[in-house]
């Protein structure tokens, strides 16, 4: 058994309070959070969480397959635009 299993899942307290409040009121607005390190709990299924990626908040609808993963896994922080092409290539016929 690895140490991380013994420690158990983690969720920020302020995010947990926001989730509980959204469940009580039945609010369907996205919950904005900067806590990418928080684990997705079963009580969060059906909610929309807007996770910050460093530039903007990305809305993520929580489904049952996501339970146990971290919120940051679903909001990529880096954009890959591809390698630049060499414009000096001449075609030889």
From Swiss-Prot:
Transmembrane segments: none annotated. One of its GO terms (cellular component) is cytoplasm. One of its GO terms (biological process) is ribosomal small subunit assembly. InterPro entries: Ribosomal_uS19 (IPR002222), Ribosomal_uS19_bac-type (IPR005732), Ribosomal_uS19_CS (IPR020934), Ribosomal_uS19_SF (IPR023575). Keywords: Ribonucleoprotein, Ribosomal protein, RNA-binding, rRNA-binding. PROSITE patterns: RIBOSOMAL_S19. The keyword Glycoprotein does not apply. GO terms for molecular function: rRNA binding; structural constituent of ribosome. Protein S19 forms a complex with S13 that binds strongly to the 16S ribosomal RNA. Belongs to the universal ribosomal protein uS19 family. PANTHER family: RIBOSOMAL PROTEIN S19P FAMILY MEMBER (PTHR11880), SMALL RIBOSOMAL SUBUNIT PROTEIN US19M (PTHR11880:SF8). This is Small ribosomal subunit protein uS19. It comes from Blochmanniella pennsylvanica (strain BPEN). The gene is rpsS.
